[in-house]
């Protein structure tokens, strides 16, 4: 049994398979997941697990070069936006329209669905390198 890091076998496998610039998405329970993209559904009830809890665990185990968010999060969920900025200090941040965000999810290696039920609590993590 693993002693630390991501314990979920599906998430751990996706993280291990990422190459430079590959993307994964951590999503609230309402984000549409495109056909053909791997769905890792962690939602057990409204709010559990939370978006921020899942983001923290994944971010601790992943080299992140860039973060993409829907620009609507700035006004409609300022608290989550602030938390993301505090948790992910080093990567570059990119804000796009929610429609553009959803289009970008079609290229993701996986989408991790949380139980989060607040608006625009979604992030695309772009893999960096560890060297």
Curated annotation (Swiss-Prot):
Biological pathway: Carbohydrate metabolism; D-ribose degradation; D-ribose 5-phosphate from beta-D-ribopyranose: step 1/2
GO function term, MF aspect, one: monosaccharide binding
GO cellular component, one term: cytosol
Compartmental location: Cytoplasm
The keyword Cytoplasm is assigned to this record: yes
Record SUPFAM superfamilies: RbsD-like
Function: Catalyzes the interconversion of beta-pyran and beta-furan forms of D-ribose.
PANTHER family cross-referenced by the UniProt entry: D-RIBOSE PYRANASE
Name of this protein: D-ribose pyranase
Organism: Bacillus cereus (strain B4264)
Lineage: Bacteria, Bacillati, Bacillota, Bacilli, Bacillales
Gene this chain is encoded by: rbsD
């Amino acid at each position: 049994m693993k002693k630390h890091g991501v314990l979920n076998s599906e998430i751990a496998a996706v993280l291990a398979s990422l190459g430079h610039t590959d993307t994964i998405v951590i999503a609230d329970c309402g984000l549409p997941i495109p056909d053909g993209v791997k769905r890792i559904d962690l939602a057990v009830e409204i709010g559990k697990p939370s978006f921020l809890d899942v983001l923290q665990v994944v971010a601790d185990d992943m080299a992140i070069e860039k973060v993409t968010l829907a620009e609507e999060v700035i006004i409609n969920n300022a608290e989550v936006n602030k938390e993301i900025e505090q948790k992910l200090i080093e990567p570059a941040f990119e804000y796009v329209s929610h429609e553009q965000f959803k289009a970008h999810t079609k290229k993701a290696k996986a989408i991790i669905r949380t139980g989060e039920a607040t608006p625009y609590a979604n992030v695309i993590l772009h893999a960096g390198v560890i060297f």
